């Protein structure tokens, strides 16, 4: 991953971890992954600060099993969280069990879609606000409190965007007639109009990600934190979510670790 002379073993402080996960966002609909139509300035700039993985794949093209997989490190069938809308078996260990003994405060703010609580005993869970928005006040308070107490943290920020119904953001930013649609879509006016609303919600999600990064900056925790961006499975248009076509399991994955990960690097490693 392009590590510098400052290795993990040489660090005297435990790094913080912040993982931002989108919801139903095809990786190729981000600017840094090749989209010519999307507006994702925060994610694109973030990619210049870390390593962008080109071959990051999920275990399954569904939300709940993917999140169980992410938080437990287990294949969903093994944890019990398969198919969608199921939960892990009692007794399954999650990232919370592994990090809390090391002194970490572990929190999830945003979408959950995981269960039971005994498997995911987060120190803090804050659901989305009414309308599905992230609670940025809770994000800032959690980071600020950990900083004040000198406690390392692992924070999962789970956005609801750009999951349908695609009713957030400003679709007027996008000209339906000039969009470059993926070749597998049926190119009709209705598809183009729908796609503008999807892109608008991606832009909305990008702003959410930018807000989270700004909070890290405000709390002066950027240089002490590993930040990961994931796009989750593809959108709900054909040949993506729910399928094992590439768009269904291929995720955007970008990692920033100041002083450790080489800025602007690209990795073809399979992750």
Describe these PLM feature segments.
Residues 1-271:
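Formylglycine-dependent sulfatase
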């Amino acid at each position: 991953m392009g590590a510098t002379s400052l290795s993990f073993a040489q660090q005297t402080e435990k790094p913080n971890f912040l993982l931002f996960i989108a919801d139903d966002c095809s990786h190729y609909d981000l600017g840094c992954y090749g989209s010519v139509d999307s507006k994702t300035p925060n994610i694109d700039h973030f990619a210049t600060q870390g390593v962008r993985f080109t071959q990051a794949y999920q275990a399954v093209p569904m939300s709940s099993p993917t999140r169980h997989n992410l938080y437990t490190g287990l294949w969903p069938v093994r944890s019990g969280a398969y198919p969608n809308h199921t939960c892990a078996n009692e007794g399954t260990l999650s990232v919370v069990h592994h990090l809390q003994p090391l002194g970490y405060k572990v929190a999830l703010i945003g979408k959950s879609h995981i269960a039971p609580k005994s498997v995911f005993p987060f120190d803090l869970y804050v659901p989305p606000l009414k309308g599905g928005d992230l609670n940025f006040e809770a994000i800032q308070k959690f980071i600020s409190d950990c900083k004040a107490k000198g406690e390392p943290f692992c924070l999962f920020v789970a956005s609801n965007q750009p999951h349908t119904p695609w009713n957030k953001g400003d679709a007027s930013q996008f000209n339906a007639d000039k969009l470059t649609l993926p070749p597998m879509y049926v190119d009709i006016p209705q598809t183009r109009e729908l796609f503008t609303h999807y892109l608008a919600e991606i832009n909305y999600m990008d702003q959410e990600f930018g807000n989270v990064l700004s909070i890290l900056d405000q709390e002066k925790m950027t240089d002490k934190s590993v930040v990961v961006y994931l796009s989750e499975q593809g959108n709900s248009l054909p040949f993506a979510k729910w399928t094992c076509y590439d768009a269904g399991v291929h995720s955007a994955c970008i990692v920033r670790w100041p002083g450790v990960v080489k800025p602007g690097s690209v990795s073809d490693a399979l992750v």
